[in-house]
Structure formats: structure tokens, C-alpha cells
């Protein structure tokens, strides 16, 4: 299932949730490194996205990005937001509320182009559970909610 950022997706089954939790637990064990690796891959593959992060200006190489405390801080926030979504899979109202708040911030305060949510979600999915339809469905749910304020 390709990741989408509009419309709706079917609810996650119990089997999908269990598979997501198992895959995510493995990734989240080293969340700081994983988060930085994901964000570095995102910025090196999508350099235009870096314009939305003034603190990352001048960080032109993967090594520069990895060594930046600002990048590490933001990577941790992203990973923890996904972790919150994984923990909230059984309480979609809670997940929705948190992600809609993030959507408002990104749309109205940071002016982030919403297309980047889908790109980043793809990298997270490929890092966590490559080709897993359930994880891609969760990433779609996250993208749809993050796009809600646009």
C-alpha cells in the first residue's frame, strides 16, 4: 500500500497493530541514532526541505547534519511523535488530537510544505518495516492527520 496524505484509510487490524509494535520496538530501542539517520536521509534526499529549518542552514553534508545538536533534537521529536502514534493505535481519538495539534503548528507557525510529511513517512516506513502494508497504513494515518490544517 502506498503512503497517502489525503482521504482516509481503513482501521488497523489487531494483527497489523501487533506487527507494527514488534517492528517499532526494534527501531525505537536506539531511537536517537535511528531518528538522526532518518532525518539525515530525508535532508540529503530532499535538500529543499532544509529551507524550513533556519537552524540547519549551512549543514550541507550528512556528517554536518549528524553532528548538529539541533538536528538530533528535531530527530528525537519526530521519532517520539511516531512513538506516541504507535502507542495510541488503540485510541485513535488521542492520536488524532496530538497529530492535529502538530499539523496546526507546522501549517500556521512553521509554514512547512505538507508534501514533506509523506516523503519523511516513506523513509520512516522503509527504515522500520520495509514493504509492510500495515506500517504504511499507520504512516498514511499520520500523514493525513498532519495535513489536516492545510
Swiss-Prot record:
Superkingdom to which the source organism belongs: Eukaryota
Keyword Oxidoreductase tagged: no
Cross-referenced SUPFAM superfamilies: Globin-like
Keyword check for Signal: no
Keywords from the UniProt entry: Heme, Iron, Metal-binding, Oxygen transport, Transport
Gene3D superfamilies cross-referenced by the UniProt entry: Globins
Domain Globin per the UniProt entry, residue ranges: 11-150
GO molecular function: heme binding; iron ion binding; oxidoreductase activity; oxygen binding; oxygen carrier activity
Residues reported in the UniProt entry to bind heme b: 74, 106
Similarity section: Belongs to the globin family.
Quaternary state and interactors: Monomer.
Protein name: Globin-1
Lineage: Eukaryota, Metazoa, Chordata, Craniata, Vertebrata
Amino acid at each position: 500500500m502506498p503512503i497517502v496524505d489525503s482521504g482516509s484509510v481503513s482501521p488497523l487490524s489487531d494483527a497489523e497493530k501487533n506487527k507494527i509494535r514488534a517492528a517499532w520496538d526494534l527501531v525505537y530501542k536506539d531511537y536517537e541514532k535511528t531518528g538522526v539517520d532518518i532525518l539525515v536521509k530525508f535532508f540529503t534526499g530532499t535538500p529543499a526541505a532544509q529551507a524550513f529549518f533556519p537552524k540547519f542552514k549551512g549543514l550541507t553534508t550528512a556528517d554536518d547534519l549528524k553532528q548538529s545538536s539541533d538536528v538530533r533534537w528535531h530527530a528525537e521529536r519526530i521519532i517520539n511523535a511516531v512513538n506516541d502514534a504507535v502507542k495510541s493505535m488503540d485510541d485513535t481519538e488521542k492520536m488524532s488530537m496530538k497529530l492535529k495539534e502538530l499539523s496546526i503548528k507546522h501549517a500556521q507557525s512553521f509554514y512547512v510544505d505538507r508534501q514533506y510529511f509523506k516523503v519523511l513517512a516513506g523513509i520512516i516506513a522503509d527504515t522500520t518495516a520495509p514493504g509492510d502494508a500495515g506500517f504504511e497504513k499507520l504512516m498514511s494515518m499520520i500523514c493525513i492527520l498532519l495535513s489536516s490544517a492545510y
